[in-house]
Amino acid sequence: MIAIDFEYNNNRLVCVCCKKSDTIYKFWLADNSDTDAFKKFVNDNKNEIFCCHALEKAEGQAFQRMDLDPTDYKWYDTYTVESIKTKATNLVFRENSLFEALSLVALEQKYLNKTSDETSDRSKHKHEMRDIIIADKELDEHKTEILDYCAEDIDSLEQIAIQQCKDYAELVEKYKAVKTFNLKLENFQKYTSYEQWMTIFVNLCHAVAIYSKCAYKGLNINDKALKIIAKKDVILENLKRAFNDKFKTDAFVFEQVVIKGRGKTKSAVTVNLHGKKDSKILDYLASQAESEIQKIHNDFIWPKSDSGKFKLDKETLKSYCICDTEFAKDLSEIETFRSGLAAVENFDKTLITHPCHHMFGAQTGRCTPKPTDGFLPCMGQLFRSFMNPRDNEHLLVSIDYSAQETAIAAAWGKDKNMLWCYQQPDFYVAAGYKFGVIDDMHATKKTHPRERDKCKLLCLTSNYGQGYKATAKLLNISEEESKDLIKKYTDTFSGYSDKRKRLLYNCSKSLVPTVLLTDDGMPYVYIPEDSAKNCKDKDDVQHIHKFFHCKSKFFCKPSTSLGNAPIQSAGATMLRYIINRLNEENIDLVCSMHDEVILNLPKESWKEQADRAIQIMTDAFKNLYGQDAYIHVGEPEVAEFNGVLIPHSDRVIPRFKKLIEFGVFSENDVKIE
C-alpha cells in the first residue's frame, strides 16, 4: 500500500507526498519541477493500492490535472469507508452528539488513540500551515516546511485504513455471523481477515474514482437562467401578488429565510399573515383547509406526521386542499423552486458546479444528495432544465428505471403477483385491482385517481414496513380499515412480504450483531434491538462501542430500516455496476442519482450510445436476479442547448408556464415547443 496526499493553493497543485513501506517520497509540483518524476512513480507502482483521504475531491482531481486517469489505479479512500460506517449511526443512535467528524484529524483520534490535547495541537498546526500554503506568496520560500507538513498526513493514512478493515474483521470473528440479504450463510472465516475487507473496499472505491472524473469535468449551468432566478425580490413580489389574487386579499407577505442546520443550509419561503411570522405557505393552507372541512365534517383532522406536523406531500395536498388541486400542486412546485435558491447561491462563479455524489453516505451505499446540498440534478425536473451539455456538439441524455424498487422487490421475493402488476401500464392501478380496491380491470389513473392514490400510499408505506396506525393516519381511515388494507397487501404480495418477514426474524432474533453482505460484497452491519437490551456482557458493549467509535446505552437498528435494506443495497449494487461499465465503454457520465444516469453524448451517435447504456442498465438487474428477471428502463430524455432555457420533458412544461404566469420568467426567456 502507498499512502498519498496532495496540497493545494486554491486550485493550484503545490506538492504531493507518498509513503511506500517506510520510505517517504516528496514531489514539488508548484513549478512542475517534479511532475514527471511523480507520474513515473505512480505508473511504476500501478499494482499497489493508493491510500488517500477524500478521493473524489482531492487525489482524483489532482491525477486528472496531470493527465492521469484515476480509474487506472487501485484506491482505498479512508473518507468513503468511514462515511459508510459512521453515517449508519443515523439509524443506530439517537443523539446528534454521537456523530463524529470525518476529517483526517478526527480519524487519527479514533483509530490511533490520539489524546484530545494531541488532536487540538494537530488541528492548530494544520490551520497554521494551511494559512501559509493558501497565502498569496512565493511558495518556494516555504518549500521544505510545506513538504514536511504534507508528509505528516501520510504517516497515519495506512494505519487508519488497516484499522478500519480490522474493525470489520474483529466484529465477524467475535460474533461469527455473516449472511447475504438472501439469508445465505457465508463462510465467516473468510471475513475474519482484514485483507479481505481491504479488497472489498478497494473495489468500492473504484466507483469513487469514476465519480472523481465526473466532478473534474463538472456540470454546465445555464448562465442566463441563473441570473434571472437570482432576482429573488422580484420573484417574491410576484409570488405574493399571485397568492393574494388567488385568495382575494392583500394580507400575505412573503419572505425568504435561510435555515442553518448541522452542516447544511437551506432556504424556505414563509408567509407573514396577520402578524403570525414564519408560517410556511403550505402549513397555512392545511390549517385553513382543516377549519373549513370541519364545518361539514366535525371529526375531520388533516393528516399529520408522527411529530404532529401537517403532512404536506403532493398526494395529501391533492386530496384535502380546499383551493383547486392544480393550485395546490403549483404551490408545492414553487416551494421546491424557491427552496433550491439557497443551493443555487453556492454554485461556483464560473457556472460550473462539481456534482458531489453522496451515494456512499449510507450503510447500504444507496444515498442521494438533497436539493439543499447544492446538487442541481436533485432539485426536481424543473431545475434539471438549467443543465446544459458540455458543448454544442453534444446532448444531455437522461435514462432511468421505471419503478426500480418495485422491480427489485418482486425479483428478490420471487413474487409473481408483484411482477404481474409491475408489467402492467400502471403498477398502482393493477395493485388496486388485485387488492379489490378497484373493481374495473381496465381502470386507469384518470378514471380512478383517489383509489390509485390510496393504493400508492399503501404500497410505499408497506414496502418500508410502516404499521397500521401510521398508515391509518396517512390515509385518514380507521385503524380497522388500515389493518384490512395491509392484510390485502401482504396476502397479495406474499412472496415479497414473507421474504421480508424471514429476514427481519432471522436477524432480529439472532441476538448478536450480524454483518449482511450485498451482492457485490458491501457490508451492512445490523445490531438487533434485543441483543442491545439484553446484553449483559460488558465486553460485547465495549466491542460495539469500539466499532462505531461512540458511547451510548442503545445501539439498535429499527426493523423498518433493515426490511428495506435489501432493496436499497441492490439498487446501489446495480448503480456501481452501471457506472463501472459506462466507464469501461467510454460513455461520458455526467452524474447519477438513485436509479438514473445523465450522459453527455455526441449528437451524431447519441442513439447508439443511449441504447448501449440501456442494455448495461438491463444487464445490471439480470446479473443479480437471473436472465429471466424483468425490469423496464424508461425512454431516454434528450436536451440540447441553444442559448435559452429549454424544459427537458413534457412533464415540466406546465410548471414553466406557471413560473411565467408568476413572473419568474418572461416568455422570451424560455423556449416551450
Residues of each region from the PLM?
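Acidic, glycine-rich two-metal-ion catalytic cores of nucleic acid-processing enzymes
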Residues: 4, 9-12, 17-22, 252-446, ...
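Conserved catalytic core of nucleic-acid polymerases
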Residues: 209-216, 437-588, 592, 635-673
